[in-house]
Amino acid sequence: MENCIVQEITYIDEYIELCEIASKSNHPNASNYNVDKMKKRWNKYLIFTKLTRGNELISFAGIVDFGNNLVRVADRLYTKQEYRQNFMTKKVINPLRPAVDYIIPYHTQWAIDRGYDCFYSIQELKKRNSLIRTVKLLNPNLGYSVLPDLYATCNPKNPRCWQNIASTTKNIHLQSKPIL
């Protein structure tokens, strides 16, 4: 693993700076990091972290409480272009895997230490295989498994809210529907 550090963000000003970087990027979900929307979201985070190597930002994400002792880790995960896995191949090409090696393990351990069950999700059914691969790459002691259905991670009327989930528990209270 690279010499990287996960740091907790405690001030909204630094959080806003990170959102500005992501919202101006060519990230497929750049609009998710709209500064005004993210300012409103700040108080929903139990923690928000960034991954750096030296002074270089690599990735960031937060943990959101979903109620009933369940949290979403790696919420609004952003990774700089040069550290992203850009192709849906079976082989992980980039040796630095920010989510798998740093963000998800750090968030999960933080949450488990406080008695939470965890999940992370990925949009779109066509990306389900990449979720399965990330679970295989994670330390098995974290306890993640891919759940069989799609789950509403936000408003169930919005098709983008129905997502694939990997979780440390099979007891998910989110609305679900079978994959057709």
Annotate each language-model stretch with its function.
Residues 1-18:
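A short beta-loop-alpha structural element at the N-terminal edge
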Residues 14-17, 21, 102, 106:
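Alpha-helical elements of Rossmann-like donor-binding domains used by nucleotide-donor carbohydrate transfer enzymes
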Residues 20-81:
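A conserved beta-strand-loop-helix scaffold within acyl/acetyltransferase catalytic domains
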Residues 46, 113-116:
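Short, high-confidence coil segments that cap the C-terminus of an alpha-helix
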Residues 85-109:
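Conserved acetyl-CoA-binding loop-helix of GNAT-fold acetyltransferases
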Residues 120-133:
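Conserved beta-strand-loop-alpha-helix junction that forms the acyl-donor binding cleft
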Residues 122-123, 136-164:
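Conserved catalytic-core motifs of GNAT/GCN5-like acyltransferases
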